[in-house]
Structure formats: structure tokens, C-alpha cells
């Protein structure tokens, strides 16, 4: 093995055309790794800090405060000198050294985007030097499980300019026997959904994550279209069984929460403005208490084949999450995203309070590969499922695909069947499945922690 010889960062663009950080790492024995950092739109308030240029000497640059040149400078002038000479395979020591150099709880000094870019690039450089695929370098010989994909085929919330308040409506091909088959099933549903939308006069424009973004009059309407698309594709809308396709939702309820109530603000605006088709919806319920929203979610679960609900309540509504998990946690995934932000301190609290039974894993929420792995391992030890996830602002970087296989998480959420920034991850997983061949497995019981 060899030492880190050079680290260089630059400003590049993500899938929304916003600046993000790219980092390259070079080793003494010609190992090379490059990584790009994703960015979220609906973010948890306790996430590690993504450093932008607003308020810095770079604010007047061409991105008007949204740039990341301060983070880039922090890599090139502060992090790089501190890490030159480190053994490239000492990932944990590298990550801990950056954490110490930053010295803050949420990485606000150097920026989580600066630290994460280096962390991921170091791992890639080590894998490159060893001539190993990244998943095998990270997970060793036991990295073998391909993940069941959650495909976000209808976008709403902060990810689309439409009337849907819940952020993501996803399909999960639970009846597939391989990753390739799962992707094929999802592809059929996606394209048949497009046909249905066109047939009923809806546009097929897409949101940030590649899903369609129609102006539906309710969440039920979105779910009805999904069920019909599944049937039209020749599959069964169900939570289990052969050729079954289930539904998952990300409510992103923190975005709906204010003064102790949940408001469907986008739908409310469409009704108040009397947008075409919304003129006669004045009696629609738009404001919910915690208990009422739990009742509403329970109603949806009883009516549709929903197997996973992410951020069903706001990040500060811990008591509500406890109630939701007690009510529905025996039959579906109650996924914490904003609630726990890939943070082991918050995850430990959620485990103690039984506030969820599944965690969403986003590498940029915590800001290093080491801390990401710690969160996955803590969840698995607590009999929770872990869902490796993209962000709405993505790049062609495919690291999360390798992470999902390396840690045998069994689930991945990385967008729809459009936009290259999403498809790149699926293509990477297809290549991994082919490379592993007979050594690969595909989860037969992905929801292993649910009581049968």
C-alpha cells in the first residue's frame, strides 16, 4: 500500500445545475480516486452543514452565493496538507483526522461537502490501487446482496412544481427474483404510467428525481394511477408474492409542519387560486393534527399496497413517530430520514424510543464514509432495515450503489427511470450483479424485521 500523494478539489455542477464539490485523490503507487458530492432540497435541520459561499469572500462569484468555492478552498488549503502522507487504506483514520481538523459537531467549519468529497475519493483511490471494485474494497468477500430498488415515479413536495404535497410515490418490485428483473418490472410500470397520464390529459414532465410531476387533486389520485400502471404492466399491486409490485411513499412531513399542525400547502394554494380542475374542492381537508395525519396514513395503507412510509411525520414530532410506529410498524417500514439524518446519536435515540423501524442512509447528511457505515451497522444490530439513498441534487457519481452492496443493506432509493444522474446508479448495480454472477443474492425477505 502507499500514502496519499495529492488531493485536489474543484467546483462542478449537479443535476439541478447548482455547484457542488468534486475531489480527486492520488497515491504514491498511482492509485486514483474521484468523487462528487450530492445535495438535498428538503433537508433535515440536523444534517451536517453543506458549506455554500453566501457570506464568504466568494459570494460575489457567478453563482451568487450558491457556489462551493469556500469548500473547495478548504479541501485544497486545509484538508489536503493535513492528509498528505496518510496511508490511503486507513479510511477510518483519514475520516477521523478530518473530523478533528473541523472540530465542530456539524462540520460547519470545513463543510460536510468538503469532508465527504475527500472521504469518498480516498476510498475510491484505495480500491483503484488494489485493483478492486469499490463494493468489494468496502465490504470484503461478503459483499454480495443486490438491493431491492425504490423507484420514485411520481414526484411532489420540494422536488416538483405541482400540486402534490407528499414528496415521493415509489414502486418496489418485491416480487422480482433478481435486480435485473426488478429494474425491468419498474421500467414497465414507469412507461405504462406515462401512457396513463397522457391518456387522462396529464403532462409527463419530470421532477428533480426523474419521476412524473402531474397536478393531481389528492394523494389518493396519485396512488390510484400507480395501481393502474402496475396492473397495466401485467403485475400484481401487492406487498408480497410473485410478480408483486408494492408502493412506498416519502411524505417529507417536516416541510408540511408549522405551529404543531400539518398543512397540505401546495394543494391549498391550487384550491384557493381556483386552478383548472380544483374549483370545487373547497371542502377538502388540508390541515391535520399529528393524530389525524396518522389516521390518514393508516387509511392509505388499508386501501393501497403500501409497504414503506418515510418521514410520515416531522423531524421534531418524536411522540408522533412513536405513535406511528406502534400503529403501523408491524406491517410496514416506518423510515426515519429527517428524524435521524444518518446520525448515530439520533439513531440511538430513535432505537430507544421505538420511533421507527428503518433508517434512510444519505452519505452527505453525516459527511463521511466512516460515519455512514457506523449508522448502517447500528441500525442492522437493532434489527432495523437500512435504505441507502440518493439526494435530489445528484451527479453521475455511483458510490452509493457500491455502498448498498458492500453493506448488504438490501434496499436502495435512487430515483426514477429517467435522468442520467439516476440511471447511472442502476447501471452500476447491473454491472455489479453481472460481475458477482452466482455469488450474488437478491433479497427474498427484504422487510425481515416486520412481524408476520
From Swiss-Prot:
Q: What is its EC number?
A: 4.2.1.11
Q: Where in the cell is it found?
A: Cytoplasm; Secreted; Cell surface
Going by the record, the broad EC class of this enzyme is lyase
The cellular component terms of Gene Ontology attached to this UniProt record, alphabetical and capped at eight, are: cell surface; extracellular region; phosphopyruvate hydratase complex
Residues that coordinate or bind (2R)-2-phosphoglycerate? 167, 362, 391-392, 413
Cite a single GO MF annotation.
Answer: magnesium ion binding
Question: Which processes are annotated in GO (biological process)?
Answer: glycolytic process
Instruction: Identify the domain of life.
Output: Bacteria
**Keywords, A to Z?**
Cytoplasm, Glycolysis, Lyase, Magnesium, Metal-binding, Secreted
Q: Which InterPro entries match?
A: Enolase, Enolase-like_C_sf, Enolase-like_N, Enolase_C, Enolase_CS, Enolase_N
Asked if the Swiss-Prot or TrEMBL record annotates the protein with the keyword Iron-sulfur, the reply is no
How many cofactors are bound and how? Binds a second Mg(2+) ion via substrate during catalysis.
Catalytic residues, per the record, are 209, 362
**PROSITE patterns, per this entry?**
ENOLASE (PS00164)
Cofactor(s) for this UniProt protein: Mg(2+)
State the pathway, as annotated in the record: Carbohydrate degradation; glycolysis; pyruvate from D-glyceraldehyde 3-phosphate: step 4/5
> Sorted alphabetically, which Pfam families does this protein's record hold?
Enolase_C, Enolase_N
Q: Which residues bind Mg(2+)?
A: 250, 310, 337
User: What reaction gets catalysed by this protein?
Assistant: (2R)-2-phosphoglycerate = phosphoenolpyruvate + H2O
NCBIfam families linked to this entry: eno
Q: What does this protein do, in the record's words?
A: Catalyzes the reversible conversion of 2-phosphoglycerate (2-PG) into phosphoenolpyruvate (PEP). It is essential for the degradation of carbohydrates via glycolysis.
> Member of which family?
Belongs to the enolase family.
Q: What is this protein called?
A: Enolase
- Gene that encodes it: eno
Amino acid at each position: 500500500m502507499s500514502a496519499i500523494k495529492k488531493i485536489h478539489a474543484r467546483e462542478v455542477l449537479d443535476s439541478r445545475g447548482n455547484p457542488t464539490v468534486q475531489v480527486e485523490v492520488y497515491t504514491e503507487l498511482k492509485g486514483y480516486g474521484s468523487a462528487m458530492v450530492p445535495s438535498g432540497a428538503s433537508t433535515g435541520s440536523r444534517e451536517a452543514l453543506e458549506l455554500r459561499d453566501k457570506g464568504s469572500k466568494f459570494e460575489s462569484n457567478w453563482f451568487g452565493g450558491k457556489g462551493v468555492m469556500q469548500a473547495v478552498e478548504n479541501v485544497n488549503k486545509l484538508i489536503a496538507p493535513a492528509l498528505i502522507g496518510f496511508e490511503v487504506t486507513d479510511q477510518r483514520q483519514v475520516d477521523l483526522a478530518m473530523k478533528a481538523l473541523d472540530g465542530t459537531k456539524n462540520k460547519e467549519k470545513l463543510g460536510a461537502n468538503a469532508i465527504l468529497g475527500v472521504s469518498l475519493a480516498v476510498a475510491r483511490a484505495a480500491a483503484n490501487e488494489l485493483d478492486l471494485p469499490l463494493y468489494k474494497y468496502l465490504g470484503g468477500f461478503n459483499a454480495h446482496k443486490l438491493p431491492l430498488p425504490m423507484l420514485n415515479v411520481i414526484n411532489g413536495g420540494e422536488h416538483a412544481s405541482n400540486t402534490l404535497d407528499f414528496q415521493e410515490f415509489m414502486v418496489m418490485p418485491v416480487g422480482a427474483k433478481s435486480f435485473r428483473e426488478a429494474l425491468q418490472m419498474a421500467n414497465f410500470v414507469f412507461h405504462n404510467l406515462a401512457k396513463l397520464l397522457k391518456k387522462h390529459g396529464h403532462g409527463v414532465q419530470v421532477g428533480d428525481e426523474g419521476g412524473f410531476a402531474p397536478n393531481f387533486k389528492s394523494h389518493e389520485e396519485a396512488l390510484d394511477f400507480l395501481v393502474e400502471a402496475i396492473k397495466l404492466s401485467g403485475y400484481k399491486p401487492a406487498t408480497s408474492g410473485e410478480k408483486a409490485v408494492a408502493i412506498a411513499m416519502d411524505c417529507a412531513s417536516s416541510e408540511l409542519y408549522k405551529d404543531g399542525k400539518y398543512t397540505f400547502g401546495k394543494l391549498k394554494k391550487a384550491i384557493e387560486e381556483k386552478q383548472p380542475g380544483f374549483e370545487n374542492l373547497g371542502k377538502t381537508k388540508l390541515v391535520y393534527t399529528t393524530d389525524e395525519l396518522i389516521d390518514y396514513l393508516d387509511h392509505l395503507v388499508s386501501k393501497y399496497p403500501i409497504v414503506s412510509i418515510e418521514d410520515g411525520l416531522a423531524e421534531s414530532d418524536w411522540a408522533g413517530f412513536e405513535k406511528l410506529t406502534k400503529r403501523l410498524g408491524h406491517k410496514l417500514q416506518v423510515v426515519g430520514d429527517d428524524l435521524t439524518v444518518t446520525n448515530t446519536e439520533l439513531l440511538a435515540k430513535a432505537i430507544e424510543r421505538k420511533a421507527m423501524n428503518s433508517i434512510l442512509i444519505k452519505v452527505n447528511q453525516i459527511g463521511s464514509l466512516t460515519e455512514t457505515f457506523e449508522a448502517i451497522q447500528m441500525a442492522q444490530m437493532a434489527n432495523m432495515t437500512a435504505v441507502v439513498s440518493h439526494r435530489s441534487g445528484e451527479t453521475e457519481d455511483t458510490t452509493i450503489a457500491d455502498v448498498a452492496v458492500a453493506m448488504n443493506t438490501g434496499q436502495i432509493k435512487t430515483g426514477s427511470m429517467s435522468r442520467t444522474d439516476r440511471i447511472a446508479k442502476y447501471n452500476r448495480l447491473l454491472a455489479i450483479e453481472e460481475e458477482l454472477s452466482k455469488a450474488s443474492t437478491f433479497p427474498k425477505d427484504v422487510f425481515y424485521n416486520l412481524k408476520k
